[in-house]
Each structure stands twice: as structure tokens, then as C-alpha cells.
Design a protein with these regions (language model features):
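Bacterial N-terminal signal peptides that target proteins for export
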Residues: 2-10
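Bacterial N-terminal signal peptides
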Residues: 11-19
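Terminal, regulation- and interaction-focused segments at domain boundaries
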Residues: 23-59
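Stable alpha-helical elements in mature extracytoplasmic
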Residues: 43, 47, 64, 136, ...
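Compact, glycine-rich, soluble single-domain proteins
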Residues: 53, 59-106, 124
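Beta-strand/loop substructures that line and gate deep hydrophobic ligand-binding cavities in soluble
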Residues: 104-130
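C-terminal partner/receptor-binding element of secreted or periplasmic proteins
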Residues: 124-153
Length: 153
């Protein structure tokens, strides 16, 4: 076996690994969380006000923690998922890219944890090829961050 034949398999393996690594998308963490200085109920009230002040309307609240408590786990930490919408922005989003409805960004969570009360959201992906979509995502992300900041001030 010649040196070239011996190096052929390792070269193919190394090349394949490098190609796989290069083709993977960047792992961006779009989850944003902040600690609230308020108790759970006050944080929820502050969030309701902040959402309204930023021209969004609450469309649904999923009180996950309360539901689990009602099923018998009385000490389960409280947690709520709040969905909200600005219909004008929703229309704009659908006109830019109708598939974005699958990534509806306007959700903020409030939960009790060992570290206190945590609020969180998932930001839209701004690293996209469509410049209109990227600008829209940046604007919505800015709103989400402002709503979260107003909640915990």
C-alpha cells in the first residue's frame, strides 16, 4: 500500500467532517430571559400594562402552573404564557413572508423558579437573507425587549 493510498481514507473523512461543520447553521440562542424584582402576580400585572402601552392586545393566557396545581401538585411553580398581537404588524409580517406565521414572536412567559420570577420570550431570527424580513424582525425584537424592560422596571 502506497502513502497516497494510506492517506486517501483519512483525507476523505477529514474533508467530509469539515464540509458538514461548514454547512451547519449557526446556533443562535433566540431565547431572552430576565429576572423580575417583583412577585409573580405583580410581574403579570406589569406585563399586561407594558403590552398595552406598546400597542399590542393580549389574545390568550395559558396558565400552565395553575393547571398543574389543579391536577394535584399543589406546590408546582406558577407559570403563564401570554400571547399578544398587533394586527397591523401581523398583516405586514404575512405580506413579507406568510411562513412567518409559524414563528409568531409575540409570546412572553412568566414563571416562578428557584432564582425568583423569570420573564422570557423568543426573539425573531434577524439573520435572514430577505432584508424586509430582517428589518421587520429587528423591529419586533425591539418591541419585545422594550415590553420586557417595562415589565421589570
Amino acid at each position: 500500500m502506497t502513502i497516497l493510498e494510506r492517506l486517501k481514507i483519512p483525507a476523505i473523512v477529514i474533508s467530509s467532517v469539515l464540509i458538514i461543520i461548514a454547512c451547519q447553521s449557526a446556533n443562535t440562542n433566540r431565547i431572552l430571559e430576565k429576572n423580575s424584582p417583583y412577585n409573580y402576580q405583580d410581574t403579570l400585572l406589569n406585563l399586561d400594562i407594558a403590552i398595552s402601552e406598546h400597542n399590542y392586545r393580549i389574545i390568550h393566557k395559558s396558565e400552565i402552573g395553575s393547571a398543574i396545581r389543579e391536577r394535584g401538585d399543589k406546590s408546582f411553580p406558577l407559570s403563564t404564557v401570554i400571547s399578544f398581537c398587533n394586527i397591523t404588524y401581523a398583516k405586514e409580517m404575512m405580506l413579507i413572508n406568510e411562513q412567518l406565521i409559524n414563528d409568531m414572536p409575540c409570546i412572553i412567559t412568566v414563571r416562578e423558579s428557584n432564582n425568583g420570577v423569570i420573564i422570557g420570550t423568543r426573539l425573531m431570527d434577524e439573520n435572514v437573507s430577505d432584508k424586509h424580513e430582517a428589518r421587520f424582525a429587528a423591529r419586533i425584537n425591539d418591541d419585545l425587549k422594550k415590553i420586557m424592560e417595562a415589565t421589570i422596571l
